[in-house]
Amino acid sequence: MNEVKIQEEMKRLKGTETEKNLYHAFAGESMAHVKYTLFAQEARKDPEMSQQLADIFDETAKNERAHAKIWFWLVGDLKKTTAEHLQMAADGENDEWTSMYPKFAETAKKEGFPQIAFLMNKIAEIEKQHETRYKMLLANVENEKLFKKDEKKLWICANCGFTCESVEAPVECPVCSHPRSFFAIKAENY
């Protein structure tokens, strides 16, 4: 692959059939990744199957994910900022709970599948929560509140478990030297 030539081609992709094909390829590879991961989990449960089979499903799933990443990179979506990714995620979740799942549930109900309709409606409720979460995270990023709060919070280092109470996460963990990006507000819900 010639990086310079690829960059040039990427500039001309917008609105082309090739761009559509890349999105379709991304969707197909993404679906294969999930499908093979699930197949691996099922193979591990089956005492009649070799664990090697599960490992091969996992290996292939990893390959499919790598393929999906290539196609997603080519359409430029991986080059966007994290804030843009959060907005894209919120938009996608919004479409799922406001349009896709309600339509699918209605079709399932009309065709005599009330349990499937029920599940689709419940999944739509979860997608709404996902949208809310992404919007809150985006607001934190835009308002520079990801690592700084108005009140003291208990921050925890995801690497070593160090905690401190402060309005702001440490720039660096004083125990393991991991950067601020490893800190989150400690949430105990047990």
Where are the regions a protein language model picked out?
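Non-heme di-metal
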Residues: 2-190
